Amino acid sequence: MKTVQEAPLARYVREYSALPGLQQADRVEYILCRHEDMLCFSARRKTAAAPVSFYTAGLEDAPACRMLCYLYENSIAPEQLRDVLADLCGWTL
């Protein structure tokens, strides 16, 4: 079992400003890490206790990094992460 956490393959942070009557200030962090032969996509709100994660295998690092960028650029909510990636990847483990 690994005890040293490897650096993420990619990381993006989306900041949301407070807009009275519309939304509260928030921050969502998107991270892609490799865990042995699996890739782990995760997204976490600043206010959430734990990130939402999606593990997949059989995907190269470069396309996975582009998928993480897609999640960030399209402001995919952490609550939607698994559904969006399941559609893009076709399966999960």
Feature roles, as predicted:
Residues 12-15, 35, 46, 83:
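Positively charged, low-complexity intrinsically disordered regions
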Residues 7-10, 40-41, 62, 78:
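General helical secondary-structure elements
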Residues 31-57:
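A short, structured beta-strand/loop element
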Residues 1-29:
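Negatively charged, low-complexity tracts enriched in Asp/Glu with abundant Ser/Thr
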